[in-house]
Every structure is written in structure tokens, then in C-alpha cells.
Design a protein with these regions (language model features):
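Internal mixed beta-strand/loop scaffold within catalytic domains of large alpha/beta enzymes
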Residues: 184-291
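Cleavable N-terminal signal peptides of Sec/SRP-targeted secreted and luminal proteins
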Residues: 3-20
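C-terminus-biased signal that marks the final domain/tail of proteins
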Residues: 21-195, 208, 296-473
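Generic detector of short alpha-helix boundary/capping microenvironments
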Residues: 5-8, 156, 253, 293, ...
Length: 473
């Protein structure tokens, strides 16, 4: 069995292309467009609501009537009012997600511990294990994952905004879970980053002239985490100690940072950037999921989001993709992918790929598509040796939108197993929409082999409809 942790370690290798043309696909891709499923558009206002002070929850169906996929049958959409401050926000969120949190939070870290140990001791993954910080490996092998995570919490806590610690304590109290477990859960991404695909298309690269941004999260499906998808929406700002912008985060119960998120004007996502941890990496800084959350919680343009990432005290090396409203482009739309580490931030735009990745021209890698309004990185080590995403971008340029990304790009590239999302911003600013997909099985109790998100139906939700659930009786 290959766990999500092992998948992350071996994602540093390039994925071999398939020479034969897949049915309904391009020759460089392993998957098939025929694997795609319909996109659902539920009426959120019509669902039964669970209400608590400062929050509301609806269960959004994941199972179309014409499919046999049965588990999970829904995902929780929790909308919380932040105007009472971080602690009350956390209490409301914890109350809304209590059952999910009690099942997930105490079990996630033990579930992953054995897989990390096996990966670190397996000679097949030895060189990839070296991409982990040496102090983490030492702490893990001596005292286990809890010790390694406690060290991470200690290193980052000084730089973690108090508002997030207060919200975490509120969540613990509201859900009835241990604060220490939440601290360890929220520290986990700092240790092992996921392999992902990022595509940001704007203007002439798209079918509508707006922005379509893909975030595909690849982490494997052998860990318990796949059973607990959550979408959380924050609305009703408290500018003194909380965000000033309504935003949505695709996450897991008790994970209060963000790795997939958007507001009405911009969206953000991340991908592992594998490099020697001794070079410009540190854990003495703000955990990157909280930096990502701050971008959509406080800012409304690509440029302001980029500047915030530059100004933050960063930790480990990651890619961060920010797309949406832009003050520097001719059409008011745009996006870029940041290569960030503890010391530097490099901006990859639609014109400078070969400056950012000069190795692309010297190592025999496939030619990366450079066209106006398009930036992307696939799930492999960059510069990628896999031509699938390049071929898909070339094939779909000028037609990119949520339907193409979900039903053509994702299943052919086989990316987005743990979750995937598309953020869309209308060219005229009239609508902002999120599409989300999650894994599932074809049995009622989740005991079967999970089907990756990229082969399941996605759900379309308008952000105004999401935020409106709080006031909709």
C-alpha cells in the first residue's frame, strides 16, 4: 500500500508519459476525458439547515442520481459569522463540525505515523526522505510523530497570529476535541507538503474572458483524511482581530489554515516545491497555510496578495498561485505563481517562465507553453519532465473554463485525488463561483477503494449564495 505520505515523497519524481492515446484524451496523458462526471448545481437555500449562534451548516449532496458512488453522500458546508471575534467564530465552527471533528482530529496523526516510519525506512524512498528536514527525521525516529510535530508547533507558535490560536481554542471547546490535537493537525502541512497542480487562466486564455483557476490537491487516498471533506465560509468581518473580506476555504475538520481558498475577487492555492531543506528553508516563521488564508481573508487584488506573501515571515518552500482581479493588467484580470521560501519570493507570470526555470531549456524537458493570460505548474517536480499538462493547455488554450478544467484536464492528467477546486471570476465582476470535487466509494460505508476526486462529480456554488445562507431562514 502506498500512503499519502509516501505519495508526497515520491512525487519528487517525474510521472512517465503514456505513449498510447487514452480513450477520449491526448497521447501524452495517462487518464481519459471519459472518466469525467457531470457537474451538479444544487440550490443551497433549499437544504435543511443546522443552526448555532454565529453559524449555519448545510450538507451538500455529492451523489448524483445517475451514479453508484455512495460514500460520502455529502460534504458539510459551514458558514460562520466572524463579527464576534475569533474565539466565538471557532466555537460556532466547532459546534457545526463536532461529529466530523471527533471522528477525524484524534485519528489523523496516529493514522499517518506508521506510514511515515515505513517511508523513511524504505530504501526506495531514501533520497526523497532527504527532502524532509533532518531535525524532523531525527525527532520522528527517536520519539515518534507527536514529538516531531510538537517541535514544529514550538518553532512556529511565536509567529502564528493570536487570532488563529484563539479560533483554534474556540473550535476545540465547541467541538469537544483537544486543543493539543488541533495544534498538531495544523502543524502537519509544514512538515510534508502535498503535490498539486495549479492553472490560472485569464482573459484570452479562457472561454469567457474572465478568470478560471484550477487547484488540484494530490496526497493519495490511503489515509483517513479523504473521508472528511469540509467547505467553510467566513463572513461578517471584525477588522480589529479578524479578516476584512468574506472568503471560502476547502479544508478538513479542525484545520483552520487554508490550502484552497477564494473570496469574491481572488483565489489562492499551493503546491509543494521540493528543494534541499538546508537551502533557504526554516520553520521559524508563520505556517504557510495561515499566510495563504490571510491572502483571501484580507486582500482583494492579485497585487496586494502577492505583496502580503512577500512581506510575511515565510517558512518552507512552496508554490502559491494567486489569480483574479488585478490592478496592473490591461483587462483588470490576471494571476501569477509565486515560488516562495524562507528568504526569497520569485514571481512566475505569463511571460517569464524560462527566466524562472532556465533548466527547462537545458535538461530535455518538454516545452512549457508560454501564452498570454496563462500560468501553470503540474504535480511533478519543476521544471516538469511530463508533457501531459503542456499538451492539455495547448489543446484548450482560449477555451479554458470550469467545465474544460474539470471534465478534460483533471481526469486526463489524473490530478486532484484528495480534492480539487476551480475558482471562476466573471470578466465584468458580476459573479464569483467555486466548483469543488471530493473522493468517494461505491459502497455505503466507505470501506471500498476510494475513487479520486478527479473522477467524481463536482459541485458548483455561487459565493453570494454561500454567504447568504447565514441570513436565509
Amino acid at each position: 500500500m502506498v500512503s499519502g505520505v509516501v505519495v508526497v515523497l515520491v512525487m519528487a519524481t517525474a510521472i512517465a508519459s503514456v505513449s498510447a492515446t487514452a480513450a477520449g484524451g491526448v497521447s501524452d496523458c495517462a487518464g481519459s476525458a471519459s472518466d469525467a462526471k457531470p457537474i451538479m448545481e444544487p440550490s443551497l437555500a433549499g437544504f435543511e439547515k443546522m443552526r448555532v449562534p454565529n453559524g449555519v451548516r448545510v450538507n451538500v449532496p455529492l451523489t448524483p442520481t445517475n451514479t453508484t458512488v455512495a460514500f460520502p453522500s455529502h460534504f458539510p458546508l459551514a458558514v460562520v459569522d466572524t463579527s464576534g471575534g475569533p474565539y466565538k467564530t471557532g466555537v460556532a465552527l466547532g459546534q457545526l463540525l463536532a461529529d466530523d471533528a471527533k471522528a477525524f482530529v484524534p485519528n489523523f496523526i496516529p493514522d499517518v505515523a506508521a506510514e511515515i516510519e515505513a517511508a523513511l525506512k524504505d530504501s526506495r524512498y531514501e533520497k526523497y526522505a532527504k527532502l524532509l528536514p533532518s531535525w524532523f527525521i531525527d525527532a520522528f525516529l527517536v520519539d515518534g510523530i507527536h514529538a516531531a510535530l510538537r517541535v514544529t508547533v514550538w518553532m512556529t507558535k511565536k509567529y502564528t497570529p493570536q487570532r488563529y490560536l484563539d479560533e483554534m481554542q474556540g473550535f476545540a471547546d465547541g467541538a469537544g476535541v483537544e486543543m493539543n490535537d488541533l495544534l498538531l493537525l495544523n502543524a502537519f502541512p509544514e512538515l510534508i507538503k502535498a503535490a498539486c497542480t495549479i492553472v490560472i487562466a485569464s482573459g484570452e486564455a479562457t472561454a469567457t474572458g474572465g478568470v478560471s483557476q484550477l487547484r488540484a490537491l494530490d496526497f493519495g487516498l490511503d489515509l483517513v483524511v479523504w473521508k472528511y471533506p469540509v467547505v467553510v465560509a467566513y463572513t461578517g468581518s471584525n477588522a480589529e482581530d479578524h479578516g476584512t473580506v468574506d472568503f471560502v476555504s476547502v479544508t478538513f475538520p479542525g484545520f483552520l489554515g487554508s490550502i484552497t481558498g477564494m473570496n469574491r475577487n481572488i483565489g489562492i492555492c499551493e503546491k509543494a516545491w521540493f528543494m534541499d531543506p538546508a537551502k533557504n528553508d526554516s520553520r521559524f516563521g508563520q505556517p504557510f497555510p495561515f499566510t495563504i488564508r490571510e491572502v483571501v481573508e484580507f486582500f482583494s487584488t492579485v497585487e496586494d496578495g502577492v505583496q502580503h506573501v512577500k512581506d510575511s515571515r515565510r517558512t518552507c518552500s512552496t508554490f502559491m498561485g494567486i489569480g483574479g482581479r488585478s490592478t496592473s493588467s490591461n483587462n483588470g484580470l490576471g494571476g501569477e505563481i509565486l515560488l516562495t521560501d524562507h528568504v526569497n519570493v520569485t514571481e512566475y507570470t505569463d511571460t517569464n517562465y524560462h527566466d524562472v526555470f532556465p533548466e527547462n531549456q537545458t535538461k530535455g524537458t518538454p516545452e512549457h507553453l508560454v501564452r498570454p493570460g496563462l500560468v501553470y505548474v503540474d504535480k511533478t517536480l519543476q521544471p516538469s519532465h511530463d508533457n501531459c499538462t503542456n499538451a492539455l493547455m495547448d489543446e484548450s488554450y482560449g477555451q479554458l473554463d470550469a467545465a474544460v478544467l474539470i471534465q478534460n484536464v483533471l481526469p486526463q492528467a489524473r490530478t486532484g485525488d484528495l480534492h480539487a477546486a476551480v475558482y471562476e471570476f466573471a470578466a465584468d465582476g458580476s459573479t464569483s463561483t467555486i466548483f469543488v470535487g471530493f473522493p468517494g466509494t461505491d459502497d455505503a460505508d466507505g470501506s471500498g477503494k476510494p475513487i479520486p476526486a478527479y473522477q467524481r462529480s463536482f459541485v458548483r456554488m455561487d459565493l453570494d449564495a454561500i454567504f447568504g445562507l447565514l441570513s436565509n431562514k
